[in-house]
């Protein structure tokens, strides 16, 4: 174990040394000395030296405004380098990869050893695998794209340096390259100057596809195929690609007025353009590779006399011409030119697939399987995974926008006000109109801008090539009419196919009512006819946790899923649950394997569809090798959950969860909603107000410009508490509820739940991880520097609560200390704390200076503001998650 860490530690210290030299070259010895002193004090403070902790606080308080930025940047950049070293460690032969035998192989062996599972059953489960990852542009990816590229290169250098047989000359060249990259990063501004537009966000998503997924997906499938051959003697069919990517970038307009119908249209075109660009590179390679002459009669008939000399090349060159014509047309459309569609325009995946597959079959039949299974197979798999649209997009809009649009329409038509009708009247009207042959929208009607936007979006969906839009997600869905309304608006736009429409249930009440809503919908004959036995439902993690606290929210999510699975099974409907979880614990994030196995039995039968948010995209898919490992983890977890589902929880366990849910929700809301001191405390003890200044995502931080916690989006709410290290949303209420149930004499039951019920043990594991990242002395320091003395008792109360919570969680889990069974994560947190602590202390100091200046009516010092932004980004890197 320790040898593993020593490889990581030596890389971290080597990168730190190079950064130190860079700082010295740029700013001189005295700044480096200052940074070194702070680092040593922080290390000693972490080891429990109180005198050094005091000295650390004093040193950072006494920095001049000129020293603030270099010190903040030094620690922030160091954390980015530490994260890069850790990312490399997870795929390096000396690191985690060495002690972590192949996930898929391990899963297959485990399944083979179950007497009740035949090899045929396992094969069928593999063939029904379905994994859809939905990339979202959450404003949590703080790191700029240019810096991400540099870190990818640093990673490549670390990989080459690991080679034992490397010559001295090469070693020196690599070290020089590392120094260049770290110097480039140091001299680059790490904070974006402007908020990204939705199109910028979409381009960020395409960059992930190009730099990592394009290579990672075929590599993952080779890995999967190899393991299946080895363990089951079974080859994957060529057309079998269980993974798809969808994006919310450019499609998610919920609370983001910057995403309009025009933007969505533009992003759809841009996505297709990027696909032609990437496939052209692939086809270019195949043109030079496939110089073979021998071919089957079928292939020769396909190419005719003209192509008989080099049939494979002939087909590839034809495909290349079509791709080039398609790309030119898309480019003109992106510039706003209206052109007729050229002949041979590629709009469907089959048009890409057919010529490639014809080559594949012919090569196989002529005994050239080794060639067929090379680059050609990778390209075929990319056609299945990415295809003509590259990534499909989801459209997401809030339910009230559809209700308002229909209200405006019914008032114009003089048939009443849809908005004020009862649910029964709304449903009757919607079903009547959905069955009607005549259009509902009058020709000469001039709706308001808001309604026009909703109708235009439906128009974009109707006109887009089928298959480029994956689903229409309705946020804040509450009733059956919310779903029917969208179907009616799409029908009016002239959509020619049944678009999957997914209600998103995201508050505690909505989760509790989700099953009733879906049961009513499935009882409508028209609706059953439309969906053809398939239904998608999205479960919201972040908003339910913000509404009720993590314990109550996670139980409501579990029960909603459980009930929906049973309802759909009874009705013969294939249900896909779409999980909207975030990167941080308060937004439902958890290590993938544990999270999936902790869901109700049967929840992955319809495949897994899950959002991958902001900063997590980089941690899980930032490099092709990491993509392979993330996709393998998901694959193993889905197979295991479907073939060896967790047991149904005992009735007594469900009753305990009901109890925990009620108590924890009361405690959570008692503070967050009912304590009059809470909002002023939150505003002053965290950088919540300053966060609004960070040019992160294209979406505003608040749903409504004024208002308390409930109007804040879930992300800034969690981000703010992560910054001051109290991590409040991820634990408040949970420990108090556990303590109460222990006092009622049920500790043995809780211990049994922890042992035998993955759902419950995952909850406790996530609490432990949060507590390991939280730091009470830092949270207290924020109070002392920033909070009015009258509010200090509330801060103290919350910190005491956390201390009590830690004790009760450890007692139930039977652990002597936090993260006892995940030493690798504990090690990683400790490694980073030494560098994150000074950033926290500095941030409290900067907030103090910035607010002081504001109080005195002075203009804020730009050096203070800039350094503050850097500490926010640095702490986010140190915590490995933002909001």
Swiss-Prot record:
Biological classification of the source: Bacteria, Pseudomonadati, Pseudomonadota, Gammaproteobacteria, Enterobacterales
Gene from which the chain derives: ppc
UniProt cofactor(s): Mg(2+)
Function: Forms oxaloacetate, a four-carbon dicarboxylic acid source for the tricarboxylic acid cycle.
PROSITE patterns according to UniProt: PEPCASE_1 (PS00781), PEPCASE_2 (PS00393)
Record's protein name: Phosphoenolpyruvate carboxylase
A biological process term (GO) from this entry: tricarboxylic acid cycle
Family indicated by similarity: Belongs to the PEPCase type 1 family.
Keywords: Carbon dioxide fixation, Lyase, Magnesium
GO molecular function, one term: phosphoenolpyruvate carboxylase activity
Documented EC number(s): 4.1.1.31
InterPro entries hit by this protein: PEP_COase, PEP_COase_bac/pln-type, PEP_COase_Lys_AS, PEPCASE_His_AS, Pyrv/PenolPyrv_kinase-like_dom
Catalytic site positions: 138, 546
Pfam families from the UniProt entry: PEPcase
Protease keyword on record: no
Recorded catalytic activity of this chain's protein: oxaloacetate + phosphate = phosphoenolpyruvate + hydrogencarbonate
Gene Ontology CC terms, in alphabetical order: cytosol
